[in-house]
Structures are given as structure tokens and as C-alpha cells.
Design a protein with these regions (language model features):
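Auxiliary Fe-S-binding modules of radical SAM enzymes
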Residues: 2-17, 210, 222-295
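Short gly/ser/thr-rich secondary-structure transition/capping motifs
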Residues: 4-6, 72, 159-163
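Iron-sulfur cluster-binding cysteine motifs and their immediate structural context
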Residues: 33-40, 59-78, 88-104
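N-terminal pre-triad scaffold of radical SAM enzymes
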Residues: 6-59, 76-85
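Hydrophobic packing within well-folded, soluble alpha/beta domains
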Residues: 32, 54, 60, 64, ...
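N-terminal-biased segments
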Residues: 15-17, 24, 41-42, 46-47, ...
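Conserved AdoMet/S-adenosylmethionine-binding subsite of the radical SAM
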Residues: 108-262
């Protein structure tokens, strides 16, 4: 069994407690307008080309089996329609202008890499977080990986948007120590506007995980143009959870514009950023509902 991995991030400190390694699986069931990891949306391998970093060395041209790269009068050009997704060019790029997202790996190939930092996990109270995209789109792989991690005494976290079936959740719940769960909106119309999908199953799954007595850290991407008026509703919802450990309010940023360009993807990022006052108000609103830890 294999999965398509978009990235591995060692020494991560924002994807759960302690020092962690975060495994980013490719493919997502939502399409959030503010997505800051567009390389994780699609399920197929993708090559990112950062033209401003290219030094026109020509290494990719000589190696590319499909002729997708060319050096001409106006420098390096890349024809994405010819790319077969092998990623070989990114391995020889001298200017770091090419980044390949989508390495195919088995659990047995991935596990030793994750165990390399076991000492750091143990001393910091960390572990391994499986994320995406939406990692549970590759649930069988996740379940096998999480099981192997638990067999090796590693703390596990699943970072999910929750837009999956309950049967899918059941595959990973036994091997997951904590869920990092995104809540973007309670109002379904708002959620559809934000993500392209309804949220009925997402809210149902949140309550289901809680009923399984699994710790839940809720993450709220705070995007003023879209969900500023949802904070009270979210607070009411979270107040009903028995296993909520903390809530993180994640202020929207628009740093990912260059990623969209490098992948030839439409940039849907909103223009308006949250100011300090609106962010503070959101946090204080959530605290009104008796939530002990809001960050």
C-alpha cells in the first residue's frame, strides 16, 4: 500500500504538542478559498516552477524525458501539459526553482524516516502528525501508518477537515491520540461559500469523535471576509464538546500567492487580512462559552 506524499516537515511545533514530524498527504475533499497549501489540493503529483529563482543552468532540460523544459531567448519555459510528474528535474535544479510535490511512498518506506526523531518526540512530548490536503482521503494508508507508529510508542495526531464518512474515521480512531479538527463555519451556506462543500457531515463527525472520548484540538481559520460572523455559533458548538483540549484561532495570511503561480493554479486568496483587534475579539468571544484555552 502506498500514498502520495506532498511533503515531510521535521521539527514542526505548530501541528500538535511538542516537537513533531508532520506528514502531508496529497489530495483534499474541500477547496477552501484561502488555502495556503494549494499543492495539497490535487491528488496527482505536481511540479512547482518558481521562475524568479531559475538560473537557466539547463540541467532540467537535459534530464526531462518528455521535453517539458526548454531554455530559449527569454530564458526557461515550462510546458506543464508535457510534464509526466516524474520529479527528476527537481532533483538536479541548482537554483531551487523546481519543487516536486507528490512522492509515492509505502508505510515501510516512510516509517523509518519518522522514527529517526523519536528521541525528540519523547523529550518534548511530541510525536507524528498526519495532515494534508485531507489525509483521510487516503485513510487505509493513514490507518496502517498510525498503527505502526503506536506499535513504536509514538504519539499520533490526525489533522483533518472532517469531510469524510464515519466509516473512514473508524479506521483511524483506534490509533489516534488526538484529532486536530478544523471548524470553519457552522452555517451551511457560509461553509459552502468558503469551501465548496456542505458541513453537515463535518459537524456530525466532530460530535462522533467526541463521543469516542478522543481528545480534540479545534482549529478555526479566521478569515474576516468569510467567517467573522460565525464565531459565536462556533463557540456555542464547541461548548457542547466533552473532550475539547484547546482552540486555536488561526489568522488568515496571504503568503501563498507565489505557490499558486508556481503551480499554474487560480489564486483564490482573499485580500482582507484580520487586524489585531478583530482577532482579539474572536478569541474573547470564544472564551465567553467557557472554553478554557483559546490561543
Amino acid at each position: 500500500m502506498h500514498a502520495i506524499i506532498s511533503d515531510l516537515k521535521r521539527f514542526a511545533v505548530h501541528d500538535g504538542d511538542g516537537i513533531r514530524t508532520t506528514v502531508f498527504l496529497k489530495g483534499c475533499s474541500l477547496k477552501c478559498v484561502w488555502c495556503h497549501n494549494p499543492e495539497g489540493i490535487g491528488f496527482k503529483p505536481q511540479l512547482a516552477f518558481y521562475k524568479d529563482k531559475c538560473i537557466d543552468c539547463g540541467e532540467c532540460v537535459s534530464l526531462c524525458p518528455s521535453g517539458a523544459h526548454k531554455i530559449g531567448e527569454h530564458g526557461h519555459s515550462f510546458d506543464r501539459s508535457l510534464c509526466i510528474g516524474c520529479g527528476k528535474c527537481s532533483e538536479v535544479c541548482l537554483g531551487n526553482a523546481l519543487t516536486f510535490y507528490g512522492k509515492k511512498m509505502t508505510v515501510d518506506e516512510l516509517l523509518p524516516l519518522l522514527l529517526e526523531d523519536k528521541e525528540f518526540y519523547e523529550t518534548s512530548g511530541g510525536g507524528v502528525t498526519v495532515s494534508g490536503g485531507e489525509c483521510l482521503c487516503q485513510a487505509d494508508f493513514c490507518a496502517e501508518l498510525l498503527k505502526k507508529l503506536k506499535e513504536n510508542g509514538i504519539h499520533t495526531a490526525v489533522d483533518t477537515c472532517g469531510f469524510v464518512s464515519q466509516n473512514t474515521l473508524d479506521k483511524v480512531i483506534p490509533y489516534t491520540d488526538i484529532f486536530l479538527y478544523d471548524v470553519k463555519a457552522v452555517d451551511e451556506a457560509v461553509h459552502i461559500k468558503c469551501t465548496g462543500q456542505p458541513n453537515r457531515q463535518i459537524l456530525k463527525n466532530l460530535k462522533y469523535i467526541d463521543s469516542c472520548n478522543k481528545p480534540i484540538e479545534v482549529r478555526i481559520p479566521f478569515v474576516p471576509e468569510y467567517n467573522a460572523n460565525e464565531i459565536d455559533k462556533i463557540g456555542e458548538l464547541l461548548a457542547t464538546l466533552k473532550n475539547l483540549t484547546k482552540v486555536r484561532v488561526l489568522p488568515y495570511h496571504n503568503y501563498a500567492g507565489s505557490k499558486y503561480k508556481s503551480l499554474d493554479m487560480e489564486n483564490t486568496l482573499p485580500e482582507k487580512l484580520p487586524d489585531d483587534e478583530s482577532l482579539k475579539n474572536a478569541i474573547e468571544t470564544l472564551k465567553k462559552y467557557g472554553i478554557k484555552e483559546v490561543i
